[in-house]
């Protein structure tokens, strides 16, 4: 390892662009991993020299200078950064003036624009992440580091090579994890008291109204709580509560008045291809009214656990005071105790997962009660709980699946995230798009938003706004409808009347059809540490225009989206958008109109479309519409290519696996390179699969190849059984190749007549 100790300072060259800088009072340093740093990254090639009291560490991207014996200060610690076109100097304590922004932890209560905290990417060409004072892992659990360890900084130097910065983040902190495939699908959520019959009816309605559904979210009314309490219900008599003293805000006992047979309900939903998540507010822990309390306390007794969390007298509920003399032992929620959290998960969460719960919606809101984790210094709950819940979900070969607010740098390893309770306004939608695109700058690739907004201040339905919000959801990481417990607001699309229902249906169908592409770029995000939603400047950092369009973004490398964030005009809600198209040739996905890039274009969209473009020549893998978009086997692959008359060559890698395990990490996947070439005469499409395959892979596949913007009909040199048709109105040629094995390689040649 390229690591050097000089007095009370230690420096570690991790990559060519990252140096760790530590300073202590006693020359004792921290080697354990933290929530941010994983310590398993390779060491970079670096040269160390010392002349007198000045040491220099040089890598390919930076030269760091430190005066031995001095505390870190602008006069004692600096670095010259030399990467590509960027030559600059960093000094300890410098402010990152031109940071491109990161992401907020939550959008709770947000109505319009909010300032963003710093992300990793900056036009200054560097950024410093401060990991000082954070606990370190010892034998699999966090412990406070020595107070003598004063400073723990990571200097990232990348110039304007933004992809390299995120790749370095993955080296230092860990890769951006791939979520379970169903996270990319259609979610339904509403803060509402549903019965088992109503949950099943929801699925029936989705199918009957021709909308896809993959995940059903059961908000907090799946368990007993104060609101709606009836005599004889289990009721909390202990705890702090939330929202005006509702002690049932935390709950772990199924409301059997509404859901008498939870296991039976979950089994029925699973048979219909629906995954289920339960809302979880853990702040009051598992108390004596819960059905899992006996198992929980038994485990704690076996561990000889003792209460460690001090009481907060001014937050104690009146109900608890009245019942404080009961001969019952209750333990405060204690995320800092390994014994407590092991019993917490095993007694309750594991049992409900055996019943059929797929993952948990960690809805932590209680920093006002517990600003710090008990016994872990200044560590706040959210990043630690995100780590614990994600680690808990990685059982029996399953890949982790979290669903929580964003916990800051390092939390990119625990997807997916929900942004919280926004207000339904056009300004909020615009800000949400901007923040989601900027979030990738911090490694946060997987935002799931309350589509339509959580709270709607308007006295009338904002139908146009809802449709446009859905269109943004189509081109983001997750399509999750959600709303507050207001009987006047219902996010079921078919309840909104026409033309809104039909417009949303078309968008939901588009999402379903795009899943092969979306899941492939999700894997690309994991593999290459690039965001799924990429700002225009990400690969075009020297182009000033790329910084001026914060709500336009690449969706992977093949598509570009610019969601409509303002009301349209007239009966068709025609919205005018100015969109910057990067260099190259682009096609409007909805109309097939061709545009030359490198400039701003003006485009109009009615309610049934929005600015969505496909790069010319890029094979776009799709599937026929299916109402279970993330679990239906890909037995029919559609590859759409907007090719036109330009000579070009391009490719895309289709990624497939079982969607739920970590088998892909050890080769259990199929990666198929889809290649398109046009030399001015012949068009060639190649299908080249690689990889070991995976359990459940389909054995027979039909391929439909769609070539758009072709002037005349074509004949085909293709595998036996191939059928060719030409649609003159759409200028689209179609080839259908039936019944081949997904493991077979082949090519198709088309020659203009």
Q: What would you call each of these model-derived segments?
A:
Residues 11, 19-21, 57-64, 560-563, ...:
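Short, well-ordered beta-strand segments enriched in hydrophobic/aromatic residues
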Residues 740-753:
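Surface-exposed interaction regions enriched in Ser/Thr/Asp/Glu
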Residues 399-400, 409-417, 431, 439-449, ...:
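Catalytic core of carbohydrate-active enzymes
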Residues 189, 194-208, 212, 216, ...:
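Gly/Pro-rich turn-and-neighbor structural signature
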Residues 12-53:
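A low-complexity, Ser/Thr/Gly/Pro-enriched, surface-exposed linker/loop concept
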Residues 48-183, 189-191, 196, 203-208, ...:
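Catalytic and substrate-binding clefts that recognize carbohydrates or anionic sugar/phosphate headgroups
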Residues 177-372:
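Aromatic-lined carbohydrate-binding/catalytic grooves of carbohydrate-active enzymes
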